[in-house]
Amino acid sequence: MSLLNSVRNVIVPVHKEGYPFVAGFFVASLVLGWVFKPLFWIGLILTLWCAYFFRDPERMTAQDDDLAISPADGKVSGVQMVTPPAELNLGTEPMLRVSIFMNVFDCHVNRSPMRGRITNIAYRQGSFLNAELDKASEQNERNGLVIETKHGEIGVVQIAGLVARRILCFVNVNEPLDAGERIGLIRFGSRLDVFFPAGAEPRVAVGQRAIAGETIIAEFGSPKGPTVSRRS
């Protein structure tokens, strides 16, 4: 293993969307330290926390079109049958929804749950309730993606939270996606909902921790053995 690869395995990169925030915190630390030296160390700690928040680690993603991978780091806050948001145009029949809540200490880079092609992106303005509340799915600001997969269309909804006030989407309509590919980011606490068509069986339970790009949250068909994975 090369020295460069060794360093990469130890130091987790910061996503480019976090650069302005990390730089801002560091400059503020210098200014505060000039006024009162102990404040520099407080500012430096906040700078390191900001870099930690915007971390963008590589993940090992299973390459199986029958598996759905977690789109976010966080706690599974809901596994239930509900009607998908109207703006996704997924119909009015209940679909399996798996919800993942991200607190301010979780990695907030969002990933595609499955391989497919984006057929729709719909943004909706809304409130900024605690994203862990069930009603946040209906009332909060959100950005929804519809992905055409081998098993039909799935919906992936980025939901803003009490602190989060900015949803970022990195992809466009008609763009192909691999499972685990980065699709967006939500700043400072939020939630991801994934809607599955008939045939999907949940593979997680409420309260379970999920890792974006790695944890299997749903599966189509019968459970299988080990699968091939790739870095994402």
UniProtKB/Swiss-Prot annotation:
Organism from which the protein derives: Rhizobium rhizogenes (strain K84 / ATCC BAA-868) (Agrobacterium radiobacter)
Subunit structure: Heterodimer of a large membrane-associated beta subunit and a small pyruvoyl-containing alpha subunit.
Chief localisation class: membrane
Protein's recorded name: Phosphatidylserine decarboxylase proenzyme
NCBIfam families given in the database record: PRK05305.1-1 (NF003677), PRK05305.1-2 (NF003678), PRK05305.1-3 (NF003679), PRK05305.2-5 (NF003685)
Sites bearing Pyruvic acid (Ser), chain numbering: 190
E.C. no: 4.1.1.65
Gene Ontology MF term list: phosphatidylserine decarboxylase activity
Enzyme class: lyase
